[in-house]
């Protein structure tokens, strides 16, 4: 229990693959020992998983490889609460703060990365239009063409049983990363729209701003975001329903202070110390983007 801490995780493995090289080639380099610190961010307000690493390089790795951007980064991360291990395929898109180390015999710098799927999808732009198509169907087509091929699939629990989904949810397997899924909530009504040279993520956000649901509940809070488990095109109400029907989601409690004593392990895992909703409602934005409709 000496390593128990819900707020801490470590990189068990970090491997860089130069642009154009194969994962199993001799060019792939393990940089785990160089990582001094790192952060990873995922949010329902973000279309992609992002992060950065601070490296202490005493072997001249930055010039020996060399690091130029667009390298593939493979991460294996373990948490100090339940020992959960997560793996992420990412792409390096920026290298900055390069300077001489305090010891004078090396350098320090920061690598910025984004999930590989989001990176490769959003280095291009698309101009397209949809006529008499539901919003969720348009999103499915944009994702299938620009992110990865997707096929209908079920979400499975750890015991092998099929996981229950909120009303009407369509679940897809992401073929390029088969362990991940894409969850799409149905929208109401058909739309006509032209996408004017947006990246795929911007295009889906454009559709989201014009989408609303009606069958299960009235809502215009559609979001497109990425997590460890995959991608989501859903409303805030869908997230509430998903939590309510998923028995494997633990009950969490809000408290500004949480004990760090390993004896209080259960309490630490179930405590939220900061909670906020940055996007509750914005009628002006919804009306401007077309997410409102008139009924007579």
PLM features: residue spans?
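Residue-identity detector for glutamine
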Residues: 12-15, 27-29, 41-42, 99, ...
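Charged- and aromatic-enriched interaction segments used to assemble
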Residues: 103-270
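Assembly/oligomerization scaffold segments
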Residues: 1-125
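Charged, gly/pro-rich, cysteine-poor intrinsically disordered low-complexity regions
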Residues: 254-296
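Acidic-enriched, low-complexity/disordered segments with a strong bias for Aspartate over Glutamate
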Residues: 5, 24, 30, 45, ...
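Helix N-terminus capping/helix-initiation residues
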Residues: 59, 199, 235, 295-296
């Amino acid at each position: 229990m000496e390593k128990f801490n819900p707020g801490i995780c470590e990189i068990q493995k970090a491997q860089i693959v130069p642009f154009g090289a194969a994962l199993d080639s001799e060019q792939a380099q393990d940089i785990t020992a160089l990582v001094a610190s790192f952060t990873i961010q995922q949010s329902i307000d973000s279309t992609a998983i992002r992060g950065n690493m601070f490296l202490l390089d005493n072997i001249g790795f930055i010039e020996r490889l060399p690091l130029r951007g667009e390298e593939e980064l493979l991460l294996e991360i373990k948490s100090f609460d339940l020992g959960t291990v997560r793996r992420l395929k990412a792409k390096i898109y920026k290298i900055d703060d390069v300077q001489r180390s305090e010891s004078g015999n090396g350098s320090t710098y920061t690598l910025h990365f984004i999930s590989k799927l989001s990176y490769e999808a959003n280095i291009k732009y698309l101009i397209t239009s949809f006529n008499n198509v539901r919003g969720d169907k348009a999103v499915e087509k944009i994702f299938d063409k620009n992110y990865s091929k997707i096929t209908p699939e079920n979400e499975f629990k750890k015991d092998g049983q099929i996981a229950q989904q909120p009303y009407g949810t369509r679940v897809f397997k992401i073929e390029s990363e088969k362990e991940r899924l894409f969850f799409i909530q149905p929208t109401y009504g058909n739309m006509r729209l032209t996408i004017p040279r947006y990246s795929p993520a911007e295009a889906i956000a454009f559709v989201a701003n014009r989408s609303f649901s009606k069958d299960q509940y009235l809502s215009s809070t559609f979001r497109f975001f990425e997590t460890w488990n995959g991608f989501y095109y859903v409303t805030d109400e869908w997230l509430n329903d998903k939590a309510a029907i998923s028995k494997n989601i633990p009950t969490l409690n809000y408290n500004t202070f949480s004990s760090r004593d390993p004896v209080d392990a259960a309490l630490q895992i179930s405590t939220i110390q900061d909670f906020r909703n940055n996007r509750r409602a914005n009628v002006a934005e919804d009306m401007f983007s077309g997410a409102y409709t008139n009924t007579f």
